[in-house]
Amino acid sequence: MKIILLGAPGAGKGTQAQFIMNKFGIPQISTGDMFRAAIKAGTELGKQAKALMDEGKLVPDELTVALVKDRIAQADCTNGFLLDGFPRTIPQADALKDSGVKIDFVLEFDVPDEVIVERMSGRRVHQASGRSYHIVYNPPKVEGKDDVTGEDLIIRADDKPETVLDRLAVYHKQTSPLIDYYQAEAKAGNTQYFRLDGTQKVEEVSQELDKILG
């Protein structure tokens, strides 16, 4: 089962990705997590990515495509995977298609911009694992602490309101065209496309996903 998640930053993709991973036993491949791991390791790619991400800009296609192709070739992706944050652009989608990767489901999470700004300013992240919480919608068991390790949670620089607005502008310009792209792919019989109302409660979205992916 090979799945792509579409939707603006903060649309709830990460939370639902956890649900899908646990339910179907496939890994989530988040370019954000891959880049954050590279940043933490202090690699050259990590340094380049950090400078761009701190400004709310996107990492260039060629860096991202190489990273993703290496990742989906690994053994844990044999039964499928979940792509979150990739592809972001039509050239990336074409590169994925050209590499012979067939996508079974494309899931779009639809949420208005103003809801996203409110959501993201309340987001807290466990840096080492990428686990994400929200002070209102999905709080940790202990305030400011990761449920699994008990380590401190942080507010990422790219979750600050002014950066969120910049990221949304970039999303609408670069990534929104993928909605049309994958709807066309679905009409051609190459994948299945579903749009979900991301303003619903987390459990309601999960139930809807369960029915779709079954």
Swiss-Prot record:
Subcellular location: Cytoplasm
Root EC class: transferase
Binding positions (ATP): 10-15, 123, 132-133, 200
Pathway(s) the chain acts in: Purine metabolism; AMP biosynthesis via salvage pathway; AMP from ADP: step 1/1
Catalyzed reaction equations: AMP + ATP = 2 ADP
Transmembrane helix is among the record's keywords: no
Protein name: Adenylate kinase
Organism for this UniProt entry: Haemophilus influenzae (strain ATCC 51907 / DSM 11121 / KW20 / Rd)
Gene: adk
